[in-house]
């Protein structure tokens, strides 16, 4: 069953009528609903095009958080072969919010790091709703060290509202773990390609996203804080999240114009959740092209370019 966002009501109404007509035709074969269904399907496409061609920042935030949007596990199943996840940080425990391991990407050995939110109550609790603890970032550091040692390109898929802010996480060095992971991303002498596939929330995202190439899906977001959090701090009113989202410049278009990201990956009409296979394939093509482009660069060159990229970003924004 499709989950509709509040601004998708015209689409919901039309698709609801299509479902009713199909059910009616099934119950009574003498009734021909083909023409009417065809007309309604045209209207659905028109409604989706009209709505999605002018989404505001808050609506894009809702799309980025859509419960049916493809997550890391969906990308991993399709993009990678022989994906072998590694567990634990060898210091405290395992953190399922960050999935990391070794795989083959179109025949090429790679290291993979991603954030997983889960898709039902049980898996969301297991993955802590995609909010990593220090152990997750230290696991990412393990993979980055391994990739650097064996010369494996790194692919990171970002989807988190932010690092977990619990007392236990802070006691175990959350800030230090995020800083070390960011430092390690900047220091490896292999190609690093990052893609924001949903939410890119604050340091929890950038800790695995300081890549040579950083891309965003068309309806993903990337920000220093959630719109609700910003509204609570600025106006002490979380209901002003829509206003905050607009002012924060969190959309892919905003960040491309600011030079924060290198490119935008188009999503199917109506968002990635309407056609996961096509957006996953498109993401794979972009990653493959980026890796091919960087294949002739030396390790020192890759590291220096990456560091300079983020130094320039800080100076120019």
Curated annotation (Swiss-Prot):
One of its GO terms (biological process) is malonyl-CoA biosynthetic process. Transmembrane segments: none annotated. Residues 40-293 form the CoA carboxyltransferase C-terminal domain. Its EC number is 2.1.3.15. GO terms for molecular function: acetyl-CoA carboxylase activity; ATP binding; carboxyl- or carbamoyltransferase activity. It comes from Rhizobium etli (strain CIAT 652). PROSITE patterns: COA_CT_CTER (PS50989). It catalyses: N(6)-carboxybiotinyl-L-lysyl-[protein] + acetyl-CoA = N(6)-biotinyl-L-lysyl-[protein] + malonyl-CoA. InterPro entries: Acetyl_CoA_COase_a_su, ClpP/crotonase-like_dom_sf, COA_CT_C. The gene is accA. This is Acetyl-coenzyme A carboxylase carboxyl transferase subunit alpha. GO terms for cellular component: acetyl-CoA carboxylase complex. It comes from the Bacteria. Component of the acetyl coenzyme A carboxylase (ACC) complex. First, biotin carboxylase catalyzes the carboxylation of biotin on its carrier protein (BCCP) and then the CO(2) group is transferred by the carboxyltransferase to acetyl-CoA to form malonyl-CoA. Its main location: cytoplasm. Pathway: Lipid metabolism; malonyl-CoA biosynthesis; malonyl-CoA from acetyl-CoA: step 1/1.
């Amino acid at each position: 069953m499709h989950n509709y966002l509040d601004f998708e009501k015209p689409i919901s109404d039309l698709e609801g009528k299509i479902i009713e007509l199909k059910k009616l035709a099934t119950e009574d074969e003498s009734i021909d609903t083909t023409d009417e269904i065809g007309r309604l399907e045209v209207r659905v496409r028109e409604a989706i095009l009209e709505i999605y061609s002018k989404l505001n920042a808050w609506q894009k935030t809702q799309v980025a958080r859509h419960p049916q949007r493809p997550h890391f596990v969906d990308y991993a199943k399709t993009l990678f072969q022989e994906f072998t996840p590694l567990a634990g940080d060898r210091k405290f425990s395992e953190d399922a919010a960050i999935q990391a391991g070794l795989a083959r990407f179109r025949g090429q050995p790679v290291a993979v790091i991603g954030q997983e939110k889960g898709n039902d109550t049980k898996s969301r609790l297991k993955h802590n709703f995609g909010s990593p603890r220090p152990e997750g970032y230290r696991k990412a550091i393990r993979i980055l060290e391994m990739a650097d040692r064996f010369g494996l390109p790194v692919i990171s898929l970002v989807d988190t509202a932010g690092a977990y802010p619990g007392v236990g996480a802070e006691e175990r060095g959350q800030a230090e773990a995020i800083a070390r992971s960011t430092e390690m991303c900047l220091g490896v002498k292999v190609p690093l390609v990052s893609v924001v596939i949903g939410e890119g929330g604050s340091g929890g995202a950038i800790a695995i996203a300081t890549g040579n190439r950083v891309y965003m899906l068309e309806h993903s977001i990337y920000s220093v804080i959630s719109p609700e959090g910003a509204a609570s701090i600025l106006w002490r009113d979380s209901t002003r999240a829509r206003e905050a989202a607009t002012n924060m410049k969190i959309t892919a278009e905003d960040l491309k114009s600011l030079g924060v990201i290198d490119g935008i990956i188009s999503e199917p009409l109506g968002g990635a959740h309407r056609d996961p296979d096509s957006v996953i394939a498109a993401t794979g093509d972009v990653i493959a092209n980026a890796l091919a482009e960087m294949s002739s660069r030396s390790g020192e060159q890759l590291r220096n370019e990456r560091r300079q990229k983020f130094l320039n970003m800080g100076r120019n924004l």
